Design a protein with these regions (language model features):
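Generic beta-sheet signal
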Residues: 73-75, 139-146
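Conserved beta-strand signature within the Rossmann-like core of class I S-adenosyl-L-methionine
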Residues: 143-148, 160, 164-179
Length: 237
């Protein structure tokens, strides 16, 4: 598979990687350093605005890859902390469906024309997954991408990834973001298999951190993959 609009014309194959930080770069090149922006003192408001922009750009790269190269046509916005996810999905693929799983008290805020909203009020992750699996809003016999990019901390990793992985009979993807160290963030994907380069700063993923000469945002992110399940076999899709 080739990443679309993520690394530019020198993009190489995007592959599943091991949990170790020694995994090879998808492009096979680690020498290029990419300065992103000048260092400057910023106000808290300006910094938050910049982080929002970078988060939206990360989601855009993920969505472009999933639509163009992975053939995903179903997206679940699981409490993403920035607006515009449904619109970004439809820009990439006009026929794609989007379901918002809304954190407590945000269903009205996240509601978008043409996108279903599954309210999280009073529901735990397991209950929400059951509702998602039985509501008919998502066909888990086909590939689906879950964007769960509200950054988690080392002490509060996401729950329900095992159950989500089991639901994805037709294969799928999980996007996560975290303020935790790389090793902790990558372990949170289990049993999903992170794609190259594992996790990297949200500002420049899918470039690995060591290829970029910038201090970054302090938020790492990545994309994990679940294989197609069926008849005792597991196939990548």
């Amino acid at each position: 598979m080739i990443v679309t609009n993520a690394r530019g014309p020198e993009t190489g194959p995007l592959t599943a990687v091991s949990r170790g930080r020694e995994s090879a770069s998808a492009t096979g090149h680690r020498s290029r350093l990419v300065p992103l922006r000048p260092c400057a003192e910023e106000s808290p408001h300006a910094l938050q605005t910049e982080h929002t922009r970078l988060h939206q750009a990360f989601l855009g790269r993920v969505i472009d890859y999933l639509c163009a190269d992975a053939g995903v046509r179903q997206f679940v916005d699981w409490g993403c902390p920035v607006p515009g996810t449904a619109e970004r999905v439809r820009d990439a693929c006009s026929g794609a469906s989007v379901v918002h799983v809304a954190p407590h008290g945000t269903a009205g805020v996240l509601s978008t024309a043409g996108a279903a909203v599954l309210s999280g009020e009073g529901s735990g992750v397991d209950a929400l997954l059951r509702r998602l699996g039985t509501s008919g809003l998502v066909d888990f016999d086909e590939p689906v991408a879950v964007l769960m990019t509200r950054p988690f901390t080392a002490g509060d990793p996401p729950t329900g990834t095992d159950a989500l992985h089991a639901l994805m009979r037709g294969g799928g993807y999980l996007a996560l973001a975290s303020t935790a160290p790389h090793a902790v963030a990558e372990r949170a994907f289990l049993p999903f298999q992170p794609l190259e380069p594992g996790v990297a700063d949200i500002a420049w993923w899918p470039y690995p951190d060591e290829d970029v000469s910038d201090k970054g945002t302090g938020i790492v992110a990545g994309l994990g993959r679940a294989p197609v399940q069926g008849r005792g076999t597991r196939r990548w899709r």
